[in-house]
A protein has these predicted regions:
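A glycine-anchored, Pro-Gly-centered beta-turn/N-cap motif
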Residues: 318, 347-348, 390, 827, ...
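Active-site mouth of glycoside hydrolases
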Residues: 32, 47-279, 368, 374-375, ...
Length: 975
């Protein structure tokens, strides 16, 4: 039964999604015309406005002490330098859609003037006045719209010919790796940083270093020396470094060793290991003692039929060999096993030798050295090989990560039927040489070890390599932080980088204000044939049974440090609507301080292009589904509508783990791993990076993971539910409800019942209270409903590519047909459709009364009046009903707005008064103080719109009065 559910949840959607969008309709939140988010703007805080954002106790605060959360987007390259008109439109759009943070990346190119702060020329000694004018204006507009700006200080820069950096022409792309190792490179780059941060923005009147608008900086972007070492990219040839820069790193390594040891003799002594114990650690390895066999045989009778016995026929050594005959198997290697007890010592090098043959060629065999006691981990050897019909000797070396007196050597034999014969099995500890011939500190000839060279480097030699690279990276981050703080006086948030490939990366960043985790789901894969073709997997992250890639952000959480997450998904994935919901929901639950969609745009042209440009898989600026969901996801995250995890699960790391990165397992880099799903049930963070003992299988502290129900991965607040079997995720809080994923049939999400009426598969619905009341009692609420989004005329190849039929404008959404119902005591319920500017555009649509006090609304995006993802739900109570009156502490429900503003030849006034039944008047007051009535009626809670008369240029005032309400609003009429 479970298998069929998994198949229906993963395989079937892929088949269905091969079809074009069903009943698509054009929609995109306006690009250039200012949005008018009057319905939800009162729920947006003022992060980034009026003062520095302050890290305190691992949380972000405004200057008045108010906690802040940032919902941001990353902008790249020329998108960081819009023209003046576009800058205003971009800032306004971001604010209207709920964003209150922006990261600007790729502003430091050396060879692309349109995407650089630097003056064109042969050196990097001056800023470009034209480019800085663009950047200054853009930052001022972002600040004006309460959007915090983060700058990547190094992302693309490499030295120019006149910068005085040796061998600049052989520096890797974007200066990666060399940023940490080349002092001349670092010195020149600091001069650029000084130029930038001492530059005075004429529109704010402040230098960047003292401008709270520049809320934070990244020291580097998508860069990590440790990551390059892990991937064996720091040698020449074969890596990213030239011969010069590889030798430069060799020199630094030799200097590190000289400081630590002083001489070759001391180095040799430190890197040496004791003489090996030469015994065979496999008792009765030749099967000669038939009365004390030592070997244990096991066959799972439910899926296999097999026997083990000694044989005297065609043996390799002595009288006997061990024979396993398998008559039946399901193909699982572990269905038939043969093992022997042994022991291993931590960090020692071993060689396993054995002879084997099989009854048929190409016979698979798996072997492992495994701990027979808790925590039952692999002990350095886990290998698949193939046997032939003739005797063959196998030699396998491994290094033991731990001491294990109850280890086991296991042969896994269940892959195939037939016979397997083993003989002369030996396990020996090996001697090791600390230095290779000719290696010496004096001649700078001590080779740096490859990350994967566990067998060729003694343990202490490898640890010194680890310490060297970690120290280099940490030293760069901390010296740059001191430069920013002490030399430049910068007061904003300082972040190191975005790559966390090892625990060592995290360690190197511990002096920063916060840690950043960057990850994503799915990616573009290029194909060799046909030329230029590509595909994506197009699978839902919600179908992943281990929390997808969200643990890649969760591991960036450290006690008393800010936690920041970046996430990306590729267009045209059908599942991109999962991204804003999952990121904001688990970000709030885990207590992350900022989340960024990565990325919004990477060129100026993107801002005015009403579709996703060809091959721009990660640009979100014109993605209808993601951008339509942004307001509700952002407000829920920023305003704490989703509760912080009730219980925490602090993780412990150790310095010993730091020095053994090859044994850092899983997302949280623990030696014995961790179930990634711990973050779905508890708030997870590193409590200490230098604990006396590392956390061991922390999932044992989560009872729900002892026998996990994959359809009910429920947070301890009971607000977030990840159903991996049905690829469904729900958020259930008093003021915010959301469901995304496999939207089929009937679903109950808190008070909201969602029934899918069409034959579609993917869908997302969010329902957000626009006042302080729970959703069933909310006077106004925002309903957002989206499915797949794609360019017009896109042609799918199966379900994974549109490389030949990318499509063009306009961006379209797949229509949803839903029946929504909830319990309500309101006397009148009206639903309005909002247009791409956020204005009332259609409706009101009535709802049906159901038995038991429930109401029902049919949402049909195939019908023209409902060609929108945004719906405003208005619930009214009779004037005598006290529930319609603003309660103590609740903000007034009355509001007034003029659009457009400044007004031109025409304009209109939109306003609402709470249903008090009091007389109401709207007056226009001209520059001479004369009044003109525009409307008279009663405050009945209705949304109203009144046209402005033709007015001469000047400053006017509107006055809306009703009972104790009085709203005055300026009206500027432009020529």
């Amino acid at each position: 039964m479970k298998l069929s559910r998994i198949l229906s949840g993963v395989v079937v959607p892929a088949l269905l999604l091969a079809q074009p969008l069903r009943s698509p309709f054009p929609f995109l939140p306006a690009l250039q015309t200012p949005l008018e988010p009057v319905w939800w703007e009162q729920l947006q805080d003022s992060s980034g406005n009026g003062g520095w954002l302050i890290p305190r106790g691992g949380e972000l605060h405004a200057r008045d002490g108010t906690p802040r959360r940032l919902f941001g987007v990353v902008l790249y390259n020329t998108a960081c330098f819009p023209d003046s008109t576009t800058a205003i439109a971009v800032a306004q759009r971001l604010q209207a859609l709920g964003f209150n943070a922006v990261a600007l990346v790729g502003i430091d190119y050396s060879n692309w003037d349109a995407s650089s702060i630097l003056q064109s020329g042969t050196s990097s000694s001056a800023l470009s006045p034209a480019q800085m004018q663009r950047l200054d204006w853009f930052i001022s507009q972002l600040a004006r719209h309460n959007i915090a700006v983060f700058l990547a200080l190094h992302a693309r820069w490499t030295p120019r010919t006149g910068d005085g950096v040796p061998r600049r022409d052989s520096i890797p792309t974007y200066g990666r790796a060399v940023l940490y190792t080349d002092s001349a490179f670092q010195q020149r780059h600091r001069a650029i940083v000084r130029l930038l941060l001492e530059h005075v923005n004429p529109y704010t009147g402040r230098a960047y270093r003292s401008d709270p608008a520049i809320a934070g900086v990244w020291l580097t972007w998508d860069n990590s020396l440790l990551n390059f070492w892990v991937n064996n990219r720091l040698h020449h040839p074969g890596g990213i470094l030239s011969h010069f820069h590889s030798r430069q790193l060799d020199t630094l390594f030799a200097a590190f060793l000289r400081r630590k040891y002083g001489s070759d003799a001391a180095l040799r002594a430190a890197w040496s290991v004791p003489a090996a114990d030469t015994q065979n650690f496999i008792p009765n390895g030749s099967f000669e003692d038939e009365f004390s066999l030592q070997w244990t045989f096991s066959s799972n009778s439910a899926v296999a039929q097999a026997v083990f016995r000694l044989t005297e026929t065609n043996v390799r050594h002595g009288r006997f060999a061990g024979l396993v005959r398998i008559a039946r198997t399901n193909g699982s290697p572990s269905s038939v096993i043969l093992y022997n007890g042994t022991q291993v010592q931590q960090d020692r090098l071993y060689e396993l030798r054995f002879w084997a043959r099989a009854s048929r060629p190409q016979r698979p065999l798996r072997l492992q050295v495994y701990n027979g006691e808790f925590p039952y981990q692999n002990l350095g050897l886990y290998r698949d090989t193939v046997l032939g019909t003739a005797w063959q000797e196998f030699r396998l070396r491994f290094r033991a990560p731990e001491t294990a007196p109850a280890a086991r050597l296991i042969f896994y034999l269940g892959q195939d039927t037939g016979e397997v014969v083993l003989d002369d099995v030996r396990l020996h500890m090996l001697d090791e040489s600390p230095l290779q011939p000719g290696e010496s500190l004096a001649t700078v000839s001590i080779a740096r070890s490859l990350y994967g060279d566990l067998l060729g480097a003694t343990p202490q030699r490898m640890r010194d390599n680890v310490e060297f690279y970690t120290e280099l990276q940490q030293r760069y981050y901390e010296s740059m932080s001191r430069f920013l703080r002490d030399s430049l006086g910068y007061r904003g948030i300082i972040l190191a980088g975005t790559l966390l490939s090892t625990f060592n990366d995290l360690w190197s960043m511990q002096a920063m204000d916060g840690i950043v985790g960057s990850t994503g789901w799915d990616y573009r894969r290029n194909r060799t044939e046909p030329q230029g073709s590509w595909f994506i997997a197009n699978t839902p992250m919600l179908g992943h049974t281990a929390a997808g890639n969200l643990p890649g952000i969760a591991r960036a959480s450290v006690r008393d440090k800010l936690s920041i997450g970046l996430f990306s998904m590729p267009f045209p994935s059908a599942h991109m609507a999962e991204m804003p919901l999952l990121l904001s929901a688990y970000g709030a639950y885990q207590g992350w301080d900022a989340v960024f969609l990565n990325y919004g745009a990477d060129s100026r042209e993107t801002y005015t292009t009403p579709f996703v440009r060809r091959d721009k898989h990660y640009e979100l600026w014109a993605h209808s589904a993601v951008m339509s969901l942004a307001p509700s996801a952002a407000i829920a995250f920023r305003n704490g509508l989703i509760r912080l995890g009730r219980d925490s699960l602090p993780l412990q790391q150790t310095r010993a783990a730091l020095l053994r990165p090859q044994w850092q397992q899983g997302s949280f880099w623990l030696r014995f791993g961790a179930d990634n799903r711990i973050m779905l049930f508890r708030r997870v963070f590193f409590d200490s990076l230098e604990a006396s003992q590392q956390s061991v299988q922390p999932q044992r502290q989560v009872p729900e993971l002892r026998e996990p129900d994959l359809s009910r991965l429920l947070s301890d607040t009971e607000e977030l539910l990840w159903n991996a079997l049905d690829t469904l995720f729900t958020v259930t809080t008093p003021r915010y409800i959301a469901v995304t994923g496999r939207l089929k049939g009937i679903l109950q999400v808190g008070p909201l019942r969602v029934e899918r009426l069409d034959s579609g598969w993917v869908g997302t619905v969010t329902w957000l209270s626009l006042d302080t009341a729970p959703l069933p009692q909310a006077r106004r609420s925002l309903l957002t409903a989206v499915s797949r989004a794609c360019n017009s005329d896109a042609v799918w190849e199966g379900s994974t590519s549109i490389w030949q039929g990318w499509g063009t404008a306009p961006m379209v959404l797949e229509a949803l047909q839903l029946r929504l119902s909830w319990e309500s005591t309101a006397d009148t319920i009206l639903v309005y459709g909002l247009d791409s500017l956020g204005r009332l555009a259609s409706g009101p649509f009535s709802v049906d009364r159901l038995p038991g006090g429930r109401v029902s609304f049919r949402l049909d995006q195939t019908a023209l009046p409902q060609h929108t993802p945004w719906f405003l739900i208005e619930q009214r109570w009779k004037p005598t009903d006290t529930t319609s009156v603003a309660e103590d502490g609740e903000p007034p429900a009355a509001w007034l707005r003029v659009t457009p503003h400044p007004a031109g030849r025409s304009g209109r006034v939109e306003f609402l008064l709470p249903p008090t039944a009091a007389a109401a008047t709207l007056l226009l007051i001209d520059p001479l103080g004369r009044t003109q009535p525009l409307w008279h009626g009663r405050a009945d809670g209705a949304l109203r719109e009144v046209a402005l008369p033709a007015l001469a240029p000047g400053l006017y005032w509107l006055e809306l009065r009703s009972g104790h309400y009085c709203i005055r609003h300026p009206v500027l009429v432009s020529p």
